[in-house]
Amino acid sequence: NNSIIITADHGMQPKSKADGSPNAIYLQDILDKKFGDNSSKVILPITDPYVVHHGALGSFATIYLEDKSKINEAMEEIKKIKEIEIVVSNEAGCEEYDLPKDRMGDIICMSSQYMTIGSSESSHDLSKLKEPLRSHGGLHEREVPFISNKKINSFLSNEKLNNYDAFYYAIAGA
């Protein structure tokens, strides 16, 4: 009579060009060119260089700026990049995506479905990448399975399930 919930921490999307090469935007390089070296710091939550599939490239980045008066200008510059879908301030992004404000930079951005974001090209050694690039971290990788071996008669709210709800429903079903 045990409750079992099966879910995942995130989905995954292909992030390669038609020729198989990685599809990446190196945001630190772009910002350094526009605003100068050391004017910003692009932080990627996927930091392990696991070259089997993602090579520390993902769909999410947060950016800290030295000069806070340049936040709007930097956001406008990033919005010009075709494959960056989401560009928002810390406050707006943390509110919309339920992120901790004290752990996010001044700007939050996410790439399109088949694009990754890197810091600088020199920071990502993709020479050992033998398979087509695939990664996660953005809106297109949020959908994951949520499977229960028991019928769930009532949900916490009318909102959709999140993978972190698994523990609650496993216990509630026990």
Enumerate the predicted regions with their spans:
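Feature captures the catalytic ectodomains and active-site-proximal regions of enzymes
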Residues: 1-174
